């Protein structure tokens, strides 16, 4: 670290919805010569993922504020004090010019200590319904940023930071116009598999006449591939040229761009990525998400005719098959264009610029 080099500390942990947008901003700041240090949990995915990106880690142990039983509630004051002490030591070691809170349990104690020690705090809320931590810290932060308008009062709508390649895909009008033949369907179950999608989609496709069936790429997580294959075979559909089952997709930008339609959950990052690429989507929100935030995430696009929202309790093979019969490449292209129009492709740059401004620095151009 040089004497003039600025330092950003990113606080984020727990799930990819917090970690991946944090990484996007971290890389943007590094490209501008900033030193970046990450504050996370040793038990979260960030502990293995972030160091692979060449970003040093500091650790805080904290399990959260929401009730998880009587013993956890009794231990909360001790755990919070311990986490605050760990956060204080980390801040003293790193001496950041600005701290960016991207969510996760550790953001609460670390955010409190950031403010109490006089360091500037920038918050970013990824979901359409703010989590408890950000609701509290938003009253103390220098700047508050949101991915969805209205998620927090008096916040700036920047969108969700995403990977650069997602924002650089060809416009949907050109992509869809260049295609012919069967529709292309991408089903994204994520690492957990989305059992409801794995069960309903094969049965829905079986209800379609062979010439009505789209070409399918179905991602389901390594643990669920065998069961998914059995579901397709039970529906009388063999996996081959028109049905490809994959455990993981490395290049999501290309996967989205090559699809006419995506069927998936509606986590904050998924919604942001689909809008950035510009692809038609049928969202089935995870019904047990905290505060049902996946429903309101999906509504942001669905209420503008930029996606379709179906609750899991309403999803059936018959409903899905009937809806698919009514779709054409033109109708899906129109949906994709509306989705793209609602995207915030410069979100990573905007969040980075805010961090730099709060630290009293300038950030050059776009990446």
Swiss-Prot record:
GO BP terms, alphabetized: carbohydrate metabolic process; cell division; cell wall organization; lipid glycosylation; peptidoglycan biosynthetic process; regulation of cell shape
GO cellular component labels: plasma membrane
Record's keyword annotation contains Signal: no
UniProt keyword annotations, A-Z: Cell cycle, Cell division, Cell inner membrane, Cell membrane, Cell shape, Cell wall biogenesis/degradation, Glycosyltransferase, Membrane, Peptidoglycan synthesis, Transferase
A molecular function GO annotation: UDP-N-acetyl-D-glucosamine:N-acetylmuramoyl-L-alanyl-D-glutamyl-meso-2,6-diaminopimelyl-D-alanyl-D-alanine-diphosphoundecaprenol 4-beta-N-acetylglucosaminlytransferase activity
InterPro entries, per database record: GlcNAc_MurG, Glyco_trans_28_C, GlycoTrans_28_N
Topological relation to the membrane, as annotated: Peripheral membrane protein
Binding site for UDP-N-acetyl-alpha-D-glucosamine: 15-17, 127, 163, 191, 249, 294
Record pathway: Cell wall biogenesis; peptidoglycan biosynthesis
Domain of life of the native organism: Bacteria
EC number, UniProt record: 2.4.1.227
Compartments (UniProt record): Cell inner membrane
Catalytic activity line of the entry: di-trans,octa-cis-undecaprenyl diphospho-N-acetyl-alpha-D-muramoyl-L-alanyl-D-glutamyl-meso-2,6-diaminopimeloyl-D-alanyl-D-alanine + UDP-N-acetyl-alpha-D-glucosamine = di-trans,octa-cis-undecaprenyl diphospho-[N-acetyl-alpha-D-glucosaminyl-(1->4)]-N-acetyl-alpha-D-muramoyl-L-alanyl-D-glutamyl-meso-2,6-diaminopimeloyl-D-alanyl-D-alanine + UDP + H(+)
Chief location: membrane
Family: Belongs to the glycosyltransferase 28 family. MurG subfamily.
HAMAP family: MurG
NCBIfam families: murG
Primary role: Cell wall formation. Catalyzes the transfer of a GlcNAc subunit on undecaprenyl-pyrophosphoryl-MurNAc-pentapeptide (lipid intermediate I) to form undecaprenyl-pyrophosphoryl-MurNAc-(pentapeptide)GlcNAc (lipid intermediate II).
Name this protein carries in UniProt: UDP-N-acetylglucosamine--N-acetylmuramyl-(pentapeptide) pyrophosphoryl-undecaprenol N-acetylglucosamine transferase
Gene designation per UniProt: murG
């Amino acid at each position: 670290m040089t004497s003039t080099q600025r330092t950003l500390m990113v606080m984020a942990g727990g799930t990819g919805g917090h970690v991946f947008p944090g990484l996007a901003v971290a890389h943007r700041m590094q490209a501008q010569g900033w030193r970046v240090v990450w504050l996370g949990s040793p038990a979260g995915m960030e502990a293995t993922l972030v160091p692979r990106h060449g970003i040093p880690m500091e650790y805080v142990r904290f399990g959260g504020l929401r009730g998880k039983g009587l013993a956890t509630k009794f231990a909360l004051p001790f755990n919070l004090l311990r986490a605050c002490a760990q956060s204080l030591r980390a801040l003293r070691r790193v001496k950041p010019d600005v701290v960016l809170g991207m969510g996760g349990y550790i953001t609460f104690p670390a955010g409190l200590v950031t403010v109490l020690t006089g360091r500037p705090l920038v918050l970013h809320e990824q979901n359409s319904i703010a989590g408890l931590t950000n609701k509290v810290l938003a009253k103390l932060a220098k700047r508050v940023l949101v991915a969805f308008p209205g998620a927090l009062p008096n916040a700036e709508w920047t969108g969700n930071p995403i990977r650069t390649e997602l924002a650089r895909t060809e416009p949907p009008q050109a992509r869809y116009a260049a295609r012919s033949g069967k529709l292309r369907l991408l089903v994204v179950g994520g690492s957990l598999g989305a059992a409801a999608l794995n069960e309903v989609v094969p049965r829905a496709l079986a209800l379609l006449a062979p010439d009505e069936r789209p070409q399918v790429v179905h991602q389901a997580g390594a643990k669920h591939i065998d069961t998914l294959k059995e579901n397709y075979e039970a529906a009388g559909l063999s996996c081959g040229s028109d049905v490809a089952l994959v455990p993981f997709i490395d290049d999501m930008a290309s996967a989205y761009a090559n699809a006419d339609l995506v069927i998936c959950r509606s986590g904050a990052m998924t919604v942001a990525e689909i809008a950035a690429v510009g692809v038609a989507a049928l969202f089935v929100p995870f019904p047990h998400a905290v505060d049902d935030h996946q429903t309101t995430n999906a509504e942001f696009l669905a209420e503008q005719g930029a996606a379709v929202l179906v609750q899991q309790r309403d999803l059936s093979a018959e409903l899905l098959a009937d809806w698919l019969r009514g779709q054409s490449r033109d109708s899906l292209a129109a949906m994709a264009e509306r989705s793209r129009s609602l995207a915030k492709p410069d979100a990573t740059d905007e969040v980075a610029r805010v961090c730099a401004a709060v630290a009293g620095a300038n950030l050059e151009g776009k990446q």
